[in-house]
């Protein structure tokens, strides 16, 4: 079984159990804290992915690192991953958990790149328009790229909506090149 499929299955099971138990918010907070630590500690991630380190030791290390920072339910999940020799999937499970939670909550993550900083009203109008377009609540990550000259580029999953001056110039160049 590929690691992506396994990560998604563990994340789905964790989210299902958290929803049934009514502690989704606690789990989200716990996993956000774990995500930060794992992102900052390459050594921790390397240890979790190492086949040389046995599951019991991985579980003890996770307990030491996160004791008091996460709930007992989260610690039990860590122990399960270690027992099943899947501790190396922890970072991927956290990402899949977030994606599934957003999916179930009708939230879509959108990357918006513009040539100039959008003011609050422009951002609000763009987000509202994207919400209508997707039919979901939009969580936008805004970034700047002065090389775009003007306009915006929006990425929603695998879909890219490119209304930048650079893109329009490239299309014009391509169209003129075909006619010549």
Curated annotation (Swiss-Prot):
Molecular function terms, GO-annotated: proton-transporting ATP synthase activity, rotational mechanism
CC per GO annotation: plasma membrane; proton-transporting ATP synthase complex
UniProt KW Membrane keyword: yes
A Pfam family: OSCP
Keyword terms of this UniProt record: ATP synthesis, Cell inner membrane, Cell membrane, CF(1), Hydrogen ion transport, Ion transport, Membrane, Transport
Similarity comment: family membership: Belongs to the ATPase delta chain family.
Functional note: F(1)F(0) ATP synthase produces ATP from ADP in the presence of a proton or sodium gradient. F-type ATPases consist of two structural domains, F(1) containing the extramembraneous catalytic core and F(0) containing the membrane proton channel, linked together by a central stalk and a peripheral stalk. During catalysis, ATP synthesis in the catalytic domain of F(1) is coupled via a rotary mechanism of the central stalk subunits to proton translocation. This protein is part of the stalk that links CF(0) to CF(1). It either transmits conformational changes from CF(0) to CF(1) or is implicated in proton conduction.
Record text on subunit structure and interactions: F-type ATPases have 2 components, F(1) - the catalytic core - and F(0) - the membrane proton channel. F(1) has five subunits: alpha(3), beta(3), gamma(1), delta(1), epsilon(1). F(0) has three main subunits: a(1), b(2) and c(10-14). The alpha and beta chains form an alternating ring which encloses part of the gamma chain. F(1) is attached to F(0) by a central stalk formed by the gamma and epsilon chains, while a peripheral stalk is formed by the delta and b chains.
HAMAP family: ATP_synth_delta_bact
Protein name stated in the entry: ATP synthase subunit delta
Taxonomic classification: Bacteria, Pseudomonadati, Chlorobiota, Chlorobiia, Chlorobiales
Gene: atpH
